[in-house]
Amino acid sequence: MENLQLVLFVLGAVAIIAVLVHGFWSIRRQQPKSLKESPMTGLYTDKTRDSDGFDADGVGPVRVVKNNAEQGIPKATSTSRATPFGARAQESEPADVSPSFSLSDEPKQKAPRSRQEPVMSATPNEEVSDAHLEQMELGLGQAPAQPSLFEDPVTERKQEAVRPAPRVEAPQSVAPASVEPVSVEPEPAPKVAEETPLGDPQDVLVLHVVAKEGEALNGAELLPSLLTLNFKFGDMDIFHRHEDNAGTGKVLFSLANMVKPGVFNPDEMEQFTTQGIVLFMTLPCYGDPLMNFSIMLNSAHQLADDLGGEVLDGGRGAWSEQTKQSYLQRIRAQM
């Protein structure tokens, strides 16, 4: 058993070492080669150049241009070529020695020519001496019509600045066209249908809510019930039911005290008692008379349930289905 454990331990250690070695080898394999091992290293070495400083592709060394602001003439340095500076200047562009005369007093401006930058060398030992420059100026002075090979860049900038600016004509002021005022007519307000007067009442529908024999309706219970049914105290000191539940609009039907004088005092409702109340609706009325009568009948039944009374017709008779149908016929007769 101990030998088996030892063998398993050795095998596990060997497996771990193999996994680590394989991981390091994979990481090294995925890393990019260094610049020294790259096969493109040879491309970055300096190519061989000939005696004139040009390589096999005809590309020369980097040229540096220097300007001498004190003398007004840029100093030029020759390259490694053996050709003298004055000879190269004469070979590059032949001089036209024939002088040109003009009768006009205004001097003519020479057309700008393509300027060739001189080849400069960054080596201070190869700069042209002042005597050499004087000889070059004397040699070039024989051809007055020949333009200088090296023109001062500041002079070119001044000549460019002398060029006349293009004329910009001021835009002619155009008188604005007369705009006629447009009259906007206000939209007519929606016409409200004028309410036709109802005229004199032709019929009155009456319902009674009376207390049971030997009892009375209590005002402390009557007032909350009336407010719940959206009645509002108003004209003639009685309660009215309006078109709107908030107590606004036309009166649909009213509620009065059955006992003379038939009025209520809201401040004394807690001490108020009565034998009954009466609900009445005149015909014709505002709105739908059938709907108004249905609301009045439901209110009468609700008050009877809340106060412990009963509903009677206009003659204080028992309310029945036949009585209801007769009331509906009276309503339809007025429609």
From Swiss-Prot:
<keyword id="KW-1003">Cell membrane</keyword>
<keyword id="KW-0997">Cell inner membrane</keyword>
<protein>
    <recommendedName>
        <fullName>Cell division protein ZipA</fullName>
    </recommendedName>
</protein>
<feature type="topological domain" description="Cytoplasmic">
    <location>
        <begin position="28"/>
        <end position="335"/>
    </location>
</feature>
<dbReference type="GO" id="GO:0005886">
    <property type="term" value="C:plasma membrane"/>
</dbReference>
<feature type="topological domain" description="Periplasmic">
    <location>
        <begin position="1"/>
        <end position="6"/>
    </location>
</feature>
<dbReference type="GO" id="GO:0043093">
    <property type="term" value="P:FtsZ-dependent cytokinesis"/>
</dbReference>
<dbReference type="GO" id="GO:0000917">
    <property type="term" value="P:division septum assembly"/>
</dbReference>
<feature type="region of interest" description="Disordered">
    <location>
        <begin position="163"/>
        <end position="185"/>
    </location>
</feature>
<keyword id="KW-0132">Cell division</keyword>
<keyword id="KW-1133">Transmembrane helix</keyword>
<keyword id="KW-0472">Membrane</keyword>
<dbReference type="InterPro" id="IPR007449">
    <property type="entry name" value="ZipA_FtsZ-bd_C"/>
</dbReference>
<keyword id="KW-0812">Transmembrane</keyword>
<comment type="subunit">
    <text>Interacts with FtsZ via their C-terminal domains.</text>
</comment>
<comment type="similarity">
    <text>Belongs to the ZipA family.</text>
</comment>
<feature type="compositionally biased region" description="Low complexity">
    <location>
        <begin position="170"/>
        <end position="185"/>
    </location>
</feature>
<dbReference type="GO" id="GO:0032153">
    <property type="term" value="C:cell division site"/>
</dbReference>
<comment type="function">
    <text>Essential cell division protein that stabilizes the FtsZ protofilaments by cross-linking them and that serves as a cytoplasmic membrane anchor for the Z ring. Also required for the recruitment to the septal ring of downstream cell division proteins.</text>
</comment>
<dbReference type="InterPro" id="IPR011919">
    <property type="entry name" value="Cell_div_ZipA"/>
</dbReference>
<keyword id="KW-0131">Cell cycle</keyword>
<dbReference type="Pfam" id="PF04354">
    <property type="entry name" value="ZipA_C"/>
</dbReference>
<feature type="transmembrane region" description="Helical">
    <location>
        <begin position="7"/>
        <end position="27"/>
    </location>
</feature>
<dbReference type="InterPro" id="IPR036765">
    <property type="entry name" value="ZipA_FtsZ-bd_C_sf"/>
</dbReference>
<feature type="region of interest" description="Disordered">
    <location>
        <begin position="37"/>
        <end position="128"/>
    </location>
</feature>
